[in-house]
Each structure stands twice: as structure tokens, then as C-alpha cells.
Amino acid sequence: MSKADVVIVGAGHGGAQCAIALRQNGFEGTITVIGREPEYPYERPPLSKEYFAREKTFDRLYIRPPTFWAEKNIEFKLGTEVTKVDPKAHELTLSNGESYGYGKLVWATGGDPRRLSCQGADLTGIHAVRTREDCDTLMAEVDAGTKNIVVIGGGYIGLEAAAVLSKMGLKVTLLEALPRVLARVAGEDLSTFYQKEHVDHGVDLRTEVMVDSLVGENGKVTGVQLAGGEVIPAEGVIVGIGIVPAVGPLIAAGAAGANGVDVDEYCRTSLPDIYAIGDCAAFACDYAGGNVMRVESVQNANDMGTCVAKAICGDEKPYKAFPWFWSNQYDLKLQTAGINLGFDKTVIRGNPEERSFSVVYLKDGRVVALDCVNMVKDYVQGRKLVEAGATPDLEALADAGKPLKELL
């Protein structure tokens, strides 16, 4: 049976960063990374933006050149999944039937796109935007003449895909079940702004609509039927309704977790010698009032990966990384600092009509998060307000001419 001192399951951002950080921190043992996809680790965010828009080729998405991993003596088993974890034996069962031993295990599998459960969900022409294969398949259909696309889901993935497709000249309809887009992650001001932007760019954006079924001919999707009976023509459908944490084997092995796998302040699961990082890991977040939650971002995956690598190398410290996020749509750059969970007030800096403004989120008078649209200085200075738990004067906070650093 093959084995490694550290086995990392998942070859995304978190898994790659953990392997890199192990070597950077002097780890000399054996490292194996097991990845479901055939590619070496690559950046995910550009998939729904620059890669799909043909602004970046795939070789520019690699986190490190493929030759880097061999140079650092990091082994990869690509196109492979873990189907079973035996924590007592410190042994994995792989999708090819092979057994693989580990000293320490780092679970960095992220999540699988949530699928529609309605009639017609198994038709061809229905896509996620999670992997290179997802995007390549959709791009091939566009190249073959697809003109009408329906995007189901008004989160960041759906909005970013809609922006790219509309810029390419396709007819895009975006459907959101809730009263506004970004309802789970942003305040009403930001939602209203982005809804208007997409409508102004030609997207048929509809909120408070429910999908009843997908209709098709000869096994291929041709439309999306709404609960009221209307059928929206669609030669392709993109589904962006969230992810399901890919933690089945860990939970089956006895790991605690209801939404992903639970980890402590050191990213340790309830199973011995097993860590979890990234989108699949639920932890008590200091920047969300100690609420146990999963944070789906590249920043979180990378920082958790570094935290675990240092712990394995003997420098164990609690995970306290500051959360941040970004999204590019059209010519708009959104930068988010902090987590707005439970906010009770917002303050607007700047003018949304000028397409350059910030939304500051407060809870009990304390700044907990910012959404900054084309406001880089606010983002850089505002994150310090969040880190400090600042309680600024609201009138001064609303004055876009007053630098946020002066409110500390």
C-alpha cells in the first residue's frame, strides 16, 4: 500500500496552498495531493470571468506551473476521488480501488454544484460553472451557435456569468427566486445597484420567480418553464444556486458536521490527524460574531491551507484570518471586507448613480463589513475599521470626501 506523511484531498486553492506552505515552512516529509479533476491546481474565479470571455487562456490560470510540483517533490494523483476514510487505520480508499495511507490528512474538497431537482434537470445543455470542463462545454455550445441562455440563480456566479454572456451578445435571462439578487450576501442597496446594471446591459432579470421544470427535445434543453406556466426559450441553462460541501466520506467516517465538516480554531476535525479547510469547513468565525459557518472564498481556502501547514510543521496557531472577497462584472470591481451577518444599519459613501460607491455595514454602531464598488481606497482603509471594531461618527462615515483612515 502506498502512503504519504501528509495527504491532501482536493487540488483546488486550499489544497494547493497547503502543499506549497508545507514546503515553505520546512516540511521535508512526503506529500501527496489527490484531485478529482485531471488538471493540476488552477484558479477558479477566472472561470466565470476572464477564461469564459476568452481574455485568459487556461495555462495562465495555473496556480503554479505543472513543473513546480515535481521540483518541490509534491506527488499528485489526478482524476481520482476518495471514497472512504478509515481514521483508525489512517487509510483511504480511492475511486480506482487502491488503498492509500496517511500520517496527517487535509480535507480540501470544496463543494459540488447544487443541482436542480425539477423535471428535466437531466437534459443536456444544463451547466454549472465550477470546473474547466464545465466552462469548456458551455463555450463549445456558444461557439456552435447557442444564442439564448437562461441563468438560474442571482448570486455572484450567476451574475458574473450573465455579465460575460451579455457582453458576448447573447440573449440572457436571469432568474432569482428571492426578492432580489445577492440577497444572502449583500444589503438591499448593493442588490438594487447590480440589478439595474444588468438590466441596463440587456439582461432580462426577473426576481421572485420559481422554476417549475426544464423542457427539451431529443434530450436537449429548449426552455425553462416557470411556476406560472410561461416557458422561456433556452438553448443553454446555467445553474448557479450554491454548492453542497463535498464531505460525504468524512461524515461517514464519523466526523462532526451538519453543513460541511466542523473544525476547531486550529482547523482540526473531530477525527484524529484530520484537518479540513476551505469551502467545506465550518468554523466559529470571529468576524461573524462567533457564528459557526462556512466561508466560500479563495482567501479563506488559502489562509486555512497556510494555517494547517504551519500547524503540521509545529507552529500551531488559531485561525484568525481576515475575510475578503471580490467580484468583477462589466467594468465594475466589487471588493468586500468583513462579513455583514446580522448588520442592523448601512451607510452609503459616494453615489451609486456614478458607479463608484461603498456600502458600510454596522452592527450596534460597530463597522462589521464593507462592499466597495470601484472604491479601492475605501476598501483598503475600510478593512482596518472592521479589524478594529471601529464605531465611527455616522455623518463623517457618510462623507465620501473624508478618508476612512481618519475615522479610526
From Swiss-Prot:
Its EC number is 1.18.1.3. Keywords: FAD, Flavoprotein, NAD, Oxidoreductase. Pfam families: Pyr_redox_2, Reductase_C. Gene3D superfamilies: 3.30.390.30, FAD/NAD(P)-binding domain. FAD binds at residues 14, 49, 82, 130, 279, 298. InterPro entries: FAD-oxidoreductase/Apoptosis, FAD/NAD-bd_sf, FAD/NAD-binding_dom, FAD/NAD-linked_Rdtase_dimer_sf, Reductase_C. It catalyses: 2 reduced [2Fe-2S]-[ferredoxin] + NAD(+) + H(+) = 2 oxidized [2Fe-2S]-[ferredoxin] + NADH. SUPFAM superfamilies: FAD/NAD(P)-binding domain, FAD/NAD-linked reductases, dimerisation (C-terminal) domain. GO terms for cellular component: cytoplasm. Monomer. The dicamba O-demethylase multicomponent enzyme system is composed of an oxygenase component (DdmC) and an electron transfer component formed by a ferredoxin reductase (DdmA1) and a ferredoxin (DdmB). In vitro, dicamba O-demethylase assays in which DdmA2 is substituted for DdmA1 demonstrate that the two enzymes possess nearly identical activities. Belongs to the FAD-dependent oxidoreductase family. This is Dicamba O-demethylase 1, ferredoxin reductase component. It comes from Stenotrophomonas maltophilia.
